[in-house]
Amino acid sequence: MAKRRERRGRRQHRSHRRIQRIIDGADFINYMPDDILHHILSFIPTDLAMRTSVLSRRWRHVWCETPCLDITLKHGAMNQTLTSYTAPIITSFKLVMDLNSNTVPQVDSWIEFALSRNVQNLSVFVRDFTYSKTYRFPDIFYLSSSLKLLDVTLDFFDMIPTCTVSWKSLRNLTLRFCQIPDESIHNILSGCPILESLTLDTCRLLERLDLSKSPNLRRLDINQQYRRTGPVAIVAPHIYYLRLTYSSTPSTIVDVSSLSEANLTIISSLLSPLTADGYQTMALEMLSKFHNVKRLTVGETLLQILSLAELRGVPFPTLKVQTLTVKTEFVRSVIPGISRLLQNSPGLKKLRPSTMKMHHLKGLYPDQCWRSTCEVFPTSKEIYKMLGCNDATLKLVASFMDLVLRNAKTLERMVVWLGGIYFNGDAPWFEEELFDMVETLSRNNNVSILLKQSNC
């Protein structure tokens, strides 16, 4: 009996100690400085942060001074509650709102609220389920000296300022799904004298993007995944970095004379031989504009189009690329394009192949038109069947590396990122043999070769 009471006492003592540790932990959080608590609350939506006010007297007003707000409004329930918000400056404000006849005034009032607190980073996502497309931002939206970052997502309605834009501190601007004509983007750019980064994601009505009067602009990111999205022409003599993603007619590059890094991606699975001809012409013209580009990234669709141009004997421009990234599987239809890029980059120092799932291009006949020249590489249909075979995978990786070393005479370093499908976890010897092969090639060719596993 005494031993039983002793065991029960030890269990109760351990339980009390666990409870005390929990209490001590809670006290530890309660005694944290307000700045740290505000930082913690900045990672959760504001409606959840507001609920912490019931935890204790210490927490009652903590959220009211949190400088980061994240609000999703489908109803007006939060309006009255947030009247108790007391922070003098908002560093980050994110607003997601469904637009209808009752919520239009609320959108305006929330924007005015954020600007009145000298918001620095502002993200606005307005969804229009009425399909009226008539909402316009109030003039005060375009007049802020505190904004440093602005991210606007609309539902394909107009973003046309009726006043002179003044965003004197703005450095990063992102516009998504906006209808913005040339005169409006000119007004906006004129009001952003220190703008450094511009992203245009699926914007309509834009014909000519002229950035010649934006000398501080260094990064330009354009996504044209839908038809009738712009710009049609790009004049950007000051930018250092360009990322261009398109699925229909790409932009015409007029001037990117300062460009040092470019990332080009075509997203399409419905190309025909006829449209491929048009892409081929535009792709080569675009490459010819990259006079000073030192870092270039291209995807598998563009490589297939360049392969088609190579087999047709179309002249390629000579590039000054020093670092080349190719995102593709090692399939037959991209090999001629990769070979020509390597040959026409006489100063290439570093190559970064990165395997990824390949989308079959209907109409380009990728499994037929280069069979005679690249038979050592599998077709886009064959590759996924052969990757389960260790010997075939070794041969494929070796063939690609040999192709690179034969065509890139100045190469110093190659970092090959292979998807997990290339590695057979059931055969440890296979990975050892793969890495041994890479080490031998590296030593024999005086090129540093690294093999890494990606998550693709």
Curated annotation (Swiss-Prot):
Transmembrane segments: none annotated. CDD domains: F-box_AtFBL13-like. Residues 26-72 form the F-box domain. InterPro entries: F-box-like_dom_sf, F-box_AtFBL13-like, F-box_dom, F-box_plant, LRR_dom_sf, LRR_FXL15/At3g58940/PEG3-like. Keywords: Leucine-rich repeat, Repeat. LRR repeats lie at residues 126-154, 177-202, 206-224, 271-300, 330-355. PANTHER family: OJ000223_09.16 PROTEIN. This is Putative F-box/LRR-repeat protein At5g02700. It comes from Arabidopsis thaliana.
